[in-house]
């Protein structure tokens, strides 16, 4: 009996150490990613890996998660403005979290349990795409908040929007604005017009359901709304005033 308890205790201790070490390794990888990707091109994201593995498991071997990294100088200014107009107009001002939007989302979700509203900023979306996974859970949101804080402390806003645009999903297997521009408009990201940029931004809430190459009435309406918001924000002057161009 003593031997059994001793062996069980030893196994429990080993498991605890394994868990602690695994957690430390993951945290270390995230910290390294925050530091390295503050200046290095991002080769792939967690969401890209998830999509690719899921496709393989389903036997969809023709699926390829594709992305082409481009610098901010090689992306049309309208594209950066479009995603901010669509997803996070307070992006230059906040430190990763839009408190007002969070409050509004909580009130909305209390009244409407069937249609949940999110309040994630571009910083949070970028962190989720780069380091984490899809889905709604308090664990993921907690990790997202912690990593977002680290990113906002280390990265510039220009870097955050650059990485966001390079890893955002714009359709099945289409990741990053360069791949999207090539796929849907047969041009480089630097040549995108305001209308094309707004169309790409319009599918971001759900790029699997919404298609830039076959936009629904809702997507077209959203595109037009984004274009109006871009004008109201001040166009290219908004980017210059916030050191984002």
Swiss-Prot record:
Keyword Chaperone part of the UniProt annotation: no
Q: What does this protein do?
A: Peptidoglycan polymerase that catalyzes glycan chain elongation from lipid-linked precursors.
Task: Indicate whether Phosphoprotein appears among the record's keywords.
Answer: no
The GO molecular function terms of this record are: pentosyltransferase activity; peptidoglycan glycosyltransferase activity
Chemical reaction(s) catalysed: [GlcNAc-(1->4)-Mur2Ac(oyl-L-Ala-gamma-D-Glu-L-Lys-D-Ala-D-Ala)](n)-di-trans,octa-cis-undecaprenyl diphosphate + beta-D-GlcNAc-(1->4)-Mur2Ac(oyl-L-Ala-gamma-D-Glu-L-Lys-D-Ala-D-Ala)-di-trans,octa-cis-undecaprenyl diphosphate = [GlcNAc-(1->4)-Mur2Ac(oyl-L-Ala-gamma-D-Glu-L-Lys-D-Ala-D-Ala)](n+1)-di-trans,octa-cis-undecaprenyl diphosphate + di-trans,octa-cis-undecaprenyl diphosphate + H(+)
Please give the PANTHER family that the UniProt record associates with this protein.
BIOSYNTHETIC PEPTIDOGLYCAN TRANSGLYCOSYLASE (PTHR30400:SF0), MONOFUNCTIONAL BIOSYNTHETIC PEPTIDOGLYCAN TRANSGLYCOSYLASE (PTHR30400)
What pathway does the annotation place this protein in? Cell wall biogenesis; peptidoglycan biosynthesis
Q: Which InterPro entries match?
A: Glyco_trans_51, Lysozyme-like_dom_sf, PBP_transglycosylase, Pep_trsgly
The record describes its membrane topology as: Single-pass membrane protein
Q: Which UniProt keywords apply?
A: Cell inner membrane, Cell membrane, Cell shape, Cell wall biogenesis/degradation, Glycosyltransferase, Membrane, Peptidoglycan synthesis, Transferase, Transmembrane, Transmembrane helix
User: Would you name any one GO CC term?
Assistant: plasma membrane
Record protein name field: Biosynthetic peptidoglycan transglycosylase
Transmembrane region(s): 24-44
So which domain of life are we looking at?
Bacteria
Please name the Pfam families in this protein's record.
Transgly
Gene name, per UniProt, is: mtgA
Top enzyme class, one word, equals transferase
Q: Where is this gene product found? A: Cell inner membrane
- Family under the similarity heading: Belongs to the glycosyltransferase 51 family.
Q: Which organism is it from?
A: Pectobacterium atrosepticum (strain SCRI 1043 / ATCC BAA-672)
Database matches in HAMAP family:
PGT_MtgA
Q: What is its EC number?
A: 2.4.99.28
Swiss-Prot/TrEMBL GO biological process terms = cell wall organization; peptidoglycan biosynthetic process; regulation of cell shape
